[in-house]
């Protein structure tokens, strides 16, 4: 019998393993990226306090005003740019990148590159 691969379970397993070493502090918060089929979300999180410092997603009003889709690379670049600008406004310039168990490719890489171009260091 052929068994089907549970890709979500594999991603969650990878994410758990990575989260053991990726930890956001006040000096270097964690830039966490979550990717769904139609949208992308990014948060800057201080894990010591359990506080989200900045957030951006493809559901934000600024994103929708640009008339982009959240399920493609162009939309992911816009989300990366938005989260970086909001983090810099809060005084955060250095972060630790958390890809959420996803492969560093496509939309995940686009968020990271756009955040770097907008001024975040990681």
Curated annotation (Swiss-Prot):
A GO term (biological process) for this protein?
translation
Q: The organism sits in which domain of life?
A: Bacteria
Q: SUPFAM superfamilies, per this entry?
A: Translational machinery components
Q: Which GO terms describe its cellular component?
A: cytosolic large ribosomal subunit
Q: Which InterPro entries would you find in this protein's record?
A: Ribosomal_uL18_bac-type (IPR004389), Ribosomal_uL18_bac/euk (IPR005484)
**Which family does the UniProt entry place this protein in?**
Belongs to the universal ribosomal protein uL18 family.
Functionally, this protein is described as follows: This is one of the proteins that bind and probably mediate the attachment of the 5S RNA into the large ribosomal subunit, where it forms part of the central protuberance.
How it assembles, according to the record, is: Part of the 50S ribosomal subunit; part of the 5S rRNA/L5/L18/L25 subcomplex. Contacts the 5S and 23S rRNAs.
UniProt name for this protein: Large ribosomal subunit protein uL18
- What species was this sequence derived from? Desulfitobacterium hafniense (strain Y51)
Q: What lineage, starting at the top, does this entry show?
A: Bacteria, Bacillati, Bacillota, Clostridia, Eubacteriales
